Structure formats: structure tokens, C-alpha cells
């Protein structure tokens, strides 16, 4: 049985982690375009 607290923490961290990775990838992609790096 999964503890509700642990389940809540996991469900709370997953969207934040995905959002963080997306933002980091977007910033790197944008920076790469500015520097004209392929």
C-alpha cells in the first residue's frame, strides 16, 4: 500500500520536474539560436 503523503509528494514533484526540464531545454535551445550554434 502506498502512503498518501508519499503519493502526494511524487505527484507534486513530477509536474515540477517536467516543467523544469522543459524550461531548461527551451532556454538552451534559445541560447543556441542566439549564438548560431548547430
UniProtKB/Swiss-Prot annotation:
One of the record's GO cellular component terms: plasma membrane-derived thylakoid membrane
Bilayer-spanning residue ranges: 5-25
**Where does this protein reside within or beyond the cell?**
Cellular thylakoid membrane
* Highest taxon above the source species: Bacteria
* BP-aspect Gene Ontology terms: cytochrome complex assembly; photosynthesis
Principal cellular location given in the protein's record: membrane
* Residue ranges the record marks as coiled coil: none
| Annotated membrane topology | Single-pass membrane protein
Keyword annotations for this protein? Electron transport, Membrane, Photosynthesis, Thylakoid, Transmembrane, Transmembrane helix, Transport
GO MF terms held by the record: electron transporter, transferring electrons within cytochrome b6/f complex of photosystem II activity
Return the similarity comment.
Belongs to the PetG family.
What is its quaternary makeup?
The 4 large subunits of the cytochrome b6-f complex are cytochrome b6, subunit IV (17 kDa polypeptide, PetD), cytochrome f and the Rieske protein, while the 4 small subunits are PetG, PetL, PetM and PetN. The complex functions as a dimer.
User: Tell me, what does this protein do in biology?
Assistant: Component of the cytochrome b6-f complex, which mediates electron transfer between photosystem II (PSII) and photosystem I (PSI), cyclic electron flow around PSI, and state transitions. PetG is required for either the stability or assembly of the cytochrome b6-f complex.
Q: What is this protein called?
A: Cytochrome b6-f complex subunit 5
